[in-house]
């Protein structure tokens, strides 16, 4: 692994003669106080930082699994960590990401970034449920999800429950079929959520009226 702290280049170190000059320049800037343009740049930077913090605070992250994995290379086995992370805003957007790194923190950070790249928009009803029954499959895992009445809660387990909760679904029934692997189950749940359509979209695809859907 490479050293994260690069060595300092001797040419980059300022000489003793340059230090007083730099200090005088800083004192002149303090006396002048800077122009209005500098103040505007500072305010704009603070506003940008505040907006970025608000955007980051909208998303919730949950680690589903962390495993130590190995890769056989020419020199032997290379050990690393794999993190499965679910990212969602509890308002109809959710994603599943996988990250690998030499440490746990780096793996989780990569998993969060990967999850935000694979977001799925989920249509929610007034009772925070899903409009229709749906199923999804990934590998040997299969997941069946169906809408539920208000007050039912999230009847699911494992990584499927995490995906449904971070999507903002509060009343739903889910059934896991096949493999018990957390990653396959989470991705199967994502496939099921991605295939959901509202009643209006379903009526438009079938070429019928919305009243015929409810009848």
UniProtKB/Swiss-Prot annotation:
It comes from the Bacteria. GO terms for biological process: translation. With S4 and S12 plays an important role in translational accuracy. Located at the back of the 30S subunit body where it stabilizes the conformation of the head with respect to the body. Pfam families: Ribosomal_S5, Ribosomal_S5_C. Residues 59-122 form the S5 DRBM domain. It comes from Synechococcus sp. (strain WH7803). Belongs to the universal ribosomal protein uS5 family. The gene is rpsE. Disulfide bonds: none annotated. GO terms for cellular component: small ribosomal subunit. This is Small ribosomal subunit protein uS5. Residues 1-12 have a biased composition (Polar residues). Part of the 30S ribosomal subunit. Contacts proteins S4 and S8. GO terms for molecular function: rRNA binding; structural constituent of ribosome. The keyword Transport does not apply. Residues 27-61 have a biased composition (Basic and acidic residues). Residues 1-62 are annotated as: Disordered. Keywords: Ribonucleoprotein, Ribosomal protein, RNA-binding, rRNA-binding. The N-terminal domain interacts with the head of the 30S subunit; the C-terminal domain interacts with the body and contacts protein S4. The interaction surface between S4 and S5 is involved in control of translational fidelity.
């Amino acid at each position: 692994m490479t050293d994260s702290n690069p060595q300092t280049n001797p040419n980059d170190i300022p000489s003793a003669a340059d230090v007083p000059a730099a200090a005088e320049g800083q004192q002149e800037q303090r006396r002048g106080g800077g122009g209005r343009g500098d103040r505007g740049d500072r305010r704009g930077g603070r506003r940008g930082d505040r907006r970025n913090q608000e955007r980051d605070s909208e998303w919730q992250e949950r680690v589903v699994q962390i495993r130590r994995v190995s890769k056989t290379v020419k020199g032997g086995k290379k050990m690393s960590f794999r993190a499965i992370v679910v990212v969602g805003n509890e308002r109809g957007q959710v994603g599943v990401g996988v990250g690998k790194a030499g440490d746990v923190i780096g793996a989780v950070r990569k998993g969060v970034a990967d999850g935000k790249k694979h977001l799925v928009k989920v249509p929610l009803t007034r009772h925070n449920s899903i409009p229709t029954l749906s199923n999804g499959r990934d590998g040997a895992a299969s997941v069946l999800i169906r809408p539920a009445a208000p007050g039912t809660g999230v009847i699911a387990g494992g990584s499927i429950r995490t995906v449904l909760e971070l999507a903002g679904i509060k009343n739903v029934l889910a059934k896991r079929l096949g493999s018990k692997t957390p990653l396959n189950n989470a991705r199967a749940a994502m496939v099921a959520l991605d295939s959901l359509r509202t009643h209006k979209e379903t009526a438009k695809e079938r070429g019928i009226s919305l009243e015929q859907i409810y009848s």
